[in-house]
């Protein structure tokens, strides 16, 4: 019985730790431990990429793209269970942090980098 209880408690603890909690003031530089979360639902945010010499490497999965209109400066913030992306010029996205969904108005600008294209 104790083993079952501890197993359930461990399962609940792992679910709680994966959810974002607390307030996050608007920032272009979210905490490192939250980067995977924010980049999963709005991949074109500039903080998700390391860009140099016209090529950008994704900080989460290592994919490479050409730097263009796809990579945008983003402000992210969190208040209670609302996670928000602000892309400036009236483009923003709000979602429940506990029930996130992907959103990317710039997906058509993404151009994969290929090693043989120089």
From Swiss-Prot:
Localization terms from the record: Host endoplasmic reticulum lumen
Pfam families, alphabetized: v110
Keyword Oxidoreductase: no
Secretion signal, residue range per the UniProt entry: 1-18
Highest taxon listed in the record's lineage: Viruses
Keywords annotated in UniProt: Early protein, Glycoprotein, Host endoplasmic reticulum, Signal
Induction remark: Expressed in the early phase of the viral replicative cycle.
One GO cellular component term: host cell endoplasmic reticulum lumen
Short motif (Prevents secretion from ER): ranges: 115-118
Modifications after synthesis and translation: N-glycosylated.
Residues carrying covalently attached carbohydrate according to the record: 96
Chief localization: host cell
Signal is among the record's keywords: yes
Function: Plays a role in virus cell tropism, and may be required for efficient virus replication in macrophages.
Similarity remark: Belongs to the asfivirus MGF 110 family.
Protein name: Protein MGF 110-6L
Organism (species): African swine fever virus (strain Badajoz 1971 Vero-adapted)
Source lineage: Viruses, Varidnaviria, Bamfordvirae, Nucleocytoviricota, Pokkesviricetes
């Amino acid at each position: 019985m104790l083993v079952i209880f501890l197993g359930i408690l461990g399962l609940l603890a792992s679910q709680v730790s994966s959810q974002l909690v607390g307030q996050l003031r608007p920032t272009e530089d979210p905490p490192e431990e939250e980067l995977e979360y924010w980049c999963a639902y709005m991949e074109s945010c500039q903080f998700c990429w390391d860009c140099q010499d016209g090529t950008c490497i994704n900080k989460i999965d290592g994919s490479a793209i050409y730097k263009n209109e796809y990579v945008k400066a983003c402000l992210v913030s969190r208040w209670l269970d609302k996670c928000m992306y602000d892309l400036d010029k009236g483009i923003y996205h709000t979602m429940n942090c506990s029930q996130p969904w992907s959103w990317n108005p710039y997906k058509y600008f993404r151009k994969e980098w290929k090693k043989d294209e120089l």
